[in-house]
Amino acid sequence: QELDSYQANIFQKSGYYQDKIKFGLSNVVLIGKNSYAESSILMRYRINMPDSLLALVKSGKYIVKSATMQMIPRYLLGDKTANLNFSVYQVRSNWSPVGFDRDSIPHLVYDPIDVASGLTVNDTLVKFNIKNDVVTQWLKYSADSNSAPKNFGLLLKPKPSTKKIVGFYSAIPSSSKNETVLSVVLERPSIRKDTVGVSPFFHIYYLTGQVPQQNSNLTFQGGIGLKGALFFDLSTLPKNIIVNKAFLELNVDTTSTLDGNPSSDSLFAQILADSTTKKLTRDSTVVTVLSKKDKIYTGDVAWMVQKWQNGESNQGILLSLWDEYSSAARIAFYGSKDQNKALRPKLKIIYMQKK
């Protein structure tokens, strides 16, 4: 037997809300801006060097000749020919990836002086130079904490002319495969010249953005924790049944959607324990994936429907972008109040009566 929410005109409701993202959990860092979001990168360095060489840096006998940053793009939101331009500032307040969220942003202190030059951007590489004195200060601080300002790293902040958002894999401490590398050339005149490649040991992004105006759509947005909740009234569904399939289907509103590359082409669906607090049930680790095909995201939530029919309270479904930490995409679906009922979320349940 079958129950189709569209054919049976079942009551439903949908909406979206903003959760608080922990930026340190992302495996990607984003920089850039568009009409609804701006993203900046924080990176912190610890350059390991023998004490004997640090002492030479402090005394001015081991000199930083150049410092060049190279980063390999892995994500794009917007036109690839659009402008990406940013400034690099020295951070003067302590920060950590642990617990860094939108409430941490106002407490960030940085110098207003841009310490970067020679920025070049293409599809495969972002490259720029850092003032030699910046790295020299880091090394001097390592040698003697009283000889230079404390090193809290760098802030990469987009300029107003920027019209796209680009992402890079976040660095993993001690990994030899990191794709964000600062190459530092040091020289002891007439004696030695060395090149040291170092990656950030703290490497995160933070994104500030506008939450879209509440309308009839069900909208998701990466980087700011914009999630959705969806409820179907299944009181007309018999209790003593076995649910074989329950296909949940959402239609994309392409006019309100901006997707990136790689695409935010899946949604995670989890069962809610409380529709008000958005608390999840104890089996919240069980996630159903809604996959995209053409302009429709669909997945089988039969196990959720079965739990509700077995007596668990139907508080609805929590939905989120699969890549909400590593994307700035905005994906909009037609919601439960859309004037065109055929475009609203659909739930088609296939079941059999228990004998």
Question: Which residue ranges define each predicted feature?
Answer:
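Secreted, disulfide-rich extracellular signaling modules
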Residues: 1-355
